[in-house]
């Protein structure tokens, strides 16, 4: 996909697909990195989203995510609650355990690194769930199916992390019953 988007660019595979940068270049025409200037053209953006969609379908990639309605959370659970990010992580891990069980599989978690100390609460919650289990799964089940959590930087150029970068906004629009930004994705 990168070779197609940056045709003729010797550095094409080193460029990182980053939704925020691509959207900024497309909307404002500005970018901190010159490699994103190709996304000033709507046609290139549509080509990107069509390519991402094709990759997901062609390789039968399962995507999952979590949406936390902040207003409903505050209304239903007034007072002090756990941070939304750790709530979402627990919900995601429970669904991931379910997915792994039904596919007779094991897996690891690769999470996009946040600016420190942002990773620490997530890492702590992961270890708590590993030690205590979840609402649905025992610690043994969790430890048997999920290996470890790793926080990777965007600059590591990991294909899966770049693909995952485009999922949350699409899922949030769907959860909010809004039309997708890109018809093909």
Which residues does each PLM region occupy?
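Phosphate-ester processing/binding pockets and catalytic centers
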Residues: 1-185
């Amino acid at each position: 996909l990168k070779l197609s988007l940056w045709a003729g660019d010797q550095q094409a595979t080193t460029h990182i697909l980053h939704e925020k940068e691509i959207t900024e270049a497309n909307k404002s025409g500005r970018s901190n990195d010159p490699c994103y200037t190709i996304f000033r053209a709507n046609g290139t953006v549509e080509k990107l989203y069509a390519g991402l969609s094709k990759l997901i379908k062609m390789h039968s990639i399962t995507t999952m995510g979590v949406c936390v309605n902040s207003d409903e959370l505050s209304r239903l659970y007034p007072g002090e609650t756990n941070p939304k990010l750790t709530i979402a992580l627990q919900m995601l891990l429970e669904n991931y355990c379910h997915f792994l069980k039904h596919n007779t599989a094991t897996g690891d978690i690769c999470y996009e690194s946040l600016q420190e100390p942002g990773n620490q609460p997530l890492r702590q919650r992961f270890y708590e769930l590993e030690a205590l289990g979840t609402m649905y799964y025992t610690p043994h089940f969790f430890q048997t199916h999920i290996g470890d959590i790793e926080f990777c930087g965007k600059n590591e150029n990991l294909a899966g992390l770049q693909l995952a970068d485009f999922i949350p906004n699409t899922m949030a629009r769907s959860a909010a019953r809004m039309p997708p930004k890109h018809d093909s994705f």
